[in-house]
Every structure is written in structure tokens, then in C-alpha cells.
Amino acid sequence: MLEELWSPVAALTAAHRGRANGLITSTAVTADLLPESPRIAVVLARASWTHELALASGAFAVHLLAADPVEVSLAIFRTLGFRSGRTEEKLAEIAWHPGVTGAPLLDDALGYVEARIAGTLEGDGVTVLIGDVAAGARLREGRHFTIEDVRAHLTREDWAMWEARRAEELEQARRARAVRIAE
């Protein structure tokens, strides 16, 4: 059941000291009721390079991808979701520019929110970042990319790559839990 709780498919980006990276997150939600002080909450894998960059810089950007053209969002999904930024520059293949926080803003996104980290909640394998919204915009009209779009368009090879990355993240989370329990 928990796998059905995906929010819209979102890309999360961060940069620090000339290095930029991004990932696909399953959770990005509003985190405050007050419109005069908007906040966003996102979940990202603790083992990811993007996690390190976001914490080091104190900022991140979340992007909604567009359902149309689906090929553009699938390319972003594959690049940010299937590869490791520790071994390659994932954003080299994606058009972007720096935002007001320094976080990369994806040019082909439907829209984005930039935030400065206000707090964190650590899990064994993930961190929840709470961010004070610094900027944001809808770049164009259209429907956002959903997990249903992903399921409808990924190939068997894509799913195998996704599952392999997921297995790595699960193993890292299990090791972190074992260390925490041992302490």
C-alpha cells in the first residue's frame, strides 16, 4: 500500500561548491498552512549525492515534470533516477540554470519551488527536508507527470535499472539501521 502513496513524480536538485546533482523523489508536499510563510517537505535517500549537496548548501529545488511531452520527462526521470551523481555529472545532459538559492532549476520542468532548509527528520535510509520557500514558478500550463505515466512508459530494461537502484538504497538503509540498533 505504501508504494501507492507517491505524490506527483518530482525531481529534486541541489548544488554546492560547483557541483550540482538531482534525483527523483516520491514525496514532495506542502508543509505549512500559512500562505505568508510557505514551506515544503521532501523525502530523499540519505545515501544520495544530492542529499549531501542539499545539506551542505542549505537549499534545494523541487520540480514538477510535465506529462507532455512525455519523452522529455522520461529522459529526466531516467537520468536522475537511474544514475549516480557520485560517478557522473547527471545534470550535464539536462538544461538548467541556477536559481536564487543556487539550486539548479530544470528548464523543461512544468514548474519549480526553491527552498532553504529549515529543518530535517532523519530516518534510517531517508531524510525529510523541511524548507522555507524562497522562490517558485509555474513555467507552463499542463498536467504534471505521475507514477502512472512512469508505469505506462518505462521499458522492462528501465524497470530493471530502477529496481537495481532501489535495491542499493534498501541495502544502505538496512546497514544504517543495523548500526543504529547496535549503538
Language-model regions, residue ranges each:
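Basic, polyanion-binding surface patches
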Residues: M1-E183
